[in-house]
Amino acid sequence: MPDITLTTLQSLKQKGEKITMLTCYDATFAHTCCEAGVEVLLVGDSLGMVLQGHDSTLPVSTADMAYHVAAVKRGNNGALILADLPFMSYATTEQALSSSAQLMQAGAHMLKIEGAAWLAEPVRLLNERGVPVCVHMGLTPQTVNVLGGYKVQGRNESQARQMRADAIALEQAGAAMLLLECVPSELAAEITQAVKIPVIGIGAGNATDGQVLVLHDMLGLSLSGRSPKFVKNFMAGKDSIQAALSAYVEEVKAVTFPGAEHGFSA
């Protein structure tokens, strides 16, 4: 497929065409995802759980991330590579610049950080230095201990109002994209309409500009044997991984995934 850039993603939002994203951690799956038409490969710190076997993303290092970004780059064929800055790798200006340099030099096209409006300054800092930033809002796994577990965020009106305001503030600070995780579908739709930048959802309904899932989840692979409510097993009834990936792309583009059963209400 032709190279996907930030301009491509902005154009897809403007045209109302859904953006497809999956996590990806190695060259073989990068190639396979590209063959299926996946537009964004997220090298997520979720690798700490699905590859390394940890119970959270917190142990993942910048070196771990750089290793997997470089692997994905070698197998990539046109997708935009989005990479997570891991836990506490952007706590200070010096850390943010050093960590970002490592991941961009390894092959990332955009970096993702987790939080809310307090990230406005890091977003500005990185944007001014040529690093596009996606901000992950809602359920932010790096702060799971503060949130008290993996829970839906933005269910009460004050939280929802704050999340809408934060999204607008982050866009004004220069964020290139937002990712909403485990947010009520109606709130996610409102935020998507309120900003001009692309908004990707996971457990956030089907009115966002695109969707993302963890690769292992959508292939029915789980260490715990359980899947989150927002996951669909695309391997079910398929005879190949390629067919499962293609089905995911087709269903996201057709807005048949996610269905109402995969979302959350306020």
UniProtKB/Swiss-Prot annotation:
Gene3D superfamilies, A to Z: Phosphoenolpyruvate-binding domains
Reaction it catalyzes: 3-methyl-2-oxobutanoate + (6R)-5,10-methylene-5,6,7,8-tetrahydrofolate + H2O = 2-dehydropantoate + (6S)-5,6,7,8-tetrahydrofolate
Keyword Transmembrane among record annotations: no
Keywords associated with the record: Cytoplasm, Magnesium, Metal-binding, Pantothenate biosynthesis, Transferase
Assembly information from the UniProt record: Homodecamer; pentamer of dimers.
Entry-linked NCBIfam families: panB (TIGR00222), PRK00311.1 (NF001452)
Designated name of the protein: 3-methyl-2-oxobutanoate hydroxymethyltransferase 2
